[in-house]
């Protein structure tokens, strides 16, 4: 921009702060001051200084109840909306099951658009032991209504509809969470050793009458949540084409 002032360009500036910041390393920028309080080292009043932060009692009790046997990692400072949050991560070591092929129980999962999922449990000989279906008609209707409102607003000339999109994304996330919880529940019910899911390639342009529903289909998000839940229970994950 200095060598060629006639061309487009401007002077580079400092990067703007985003919504996710680096990890607050322990004893460097993060100190446990008590059970319900911590100290964070942040840049305030043109200097680096320690700030006392009080933790929510309900969050502390939840961590003490469900994460007592896990290793607490360094937290991360993130901004959601107009508020700042301190996100804690926990590490847990799990040994996956080692079962011979003759005695393995496999859970096959078929994710769909109309039905949330179909789960089939079979043994090594191919005998179907159990089958479960998951339908979410109320959530699907809510998603359809949210998408119709977005289409109507866009046809009337509205370029940005953040509230309508927030509603649709929230319903879509709820569908993904309920589907993943159902699959994990079926796996624990039948004590399966492996969960098999289809490798879905959702790249490219969507065509057809259901292209909008296919575009908002969060199949990979469901598979990721199922993978985390299965590994915590010692269950292996396989994907087939």
Predicted regions and their residues:
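Positively charged, helix-rich recognition surfaces that bind polyanionic ligands
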Residues: 82-241
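Acidic carboxylate diad motif detector
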Residues: 1-80
């Amino acid at each position: 921009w200095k060598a060629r002032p006639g061309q487009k360009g401007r002077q580079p500036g400092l990067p703007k702060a985003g919504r996710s910041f680096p990890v607050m390393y322990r004893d460097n920028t993060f100190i446990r001051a008590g059970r319900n309080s911590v100290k964070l080292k942040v840049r305030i009043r043109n200097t680096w200084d320690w700030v006392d932060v009080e933790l929510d009692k309900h969050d502390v009790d939840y961590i003490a109840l469900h994460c007592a046997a896990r290793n607490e990692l360094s937290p991360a400072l993130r901004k959601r909306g107009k508020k700042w949050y301190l996100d804690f991560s926990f590490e847990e070591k799990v040994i996956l099951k080692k079962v011979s092929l003759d005695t393995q129980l496999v859970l096959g999962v078929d994710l769909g658009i109309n039905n949330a999922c179909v789960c089939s449990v079979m043994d090594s000989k191919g005998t179907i032991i159990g089958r479960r279906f998951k339908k979410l008609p109320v959530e699907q209707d809510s998603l359809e209504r949210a998408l119709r409102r977005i289409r109507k607003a866009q046809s009337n000339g509205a370029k940005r509809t953040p509230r309508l999109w927030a509603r649709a994304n929230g319903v879509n996330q709820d569908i993904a969470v309920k589907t993943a919880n159902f699959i994990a529940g079926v796996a624990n019910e039948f004590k399966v050793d492996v969960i098999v899911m289809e490798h879905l390639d959702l790249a490219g342009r969507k065509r057809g009458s259901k292209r909008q529903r296919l575009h908002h289909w969060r199949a990979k998000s469901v598979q990721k949540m199922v993978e985390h839940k299965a590994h915590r229970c010692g269950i292996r994950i396989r994907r087939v084409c």
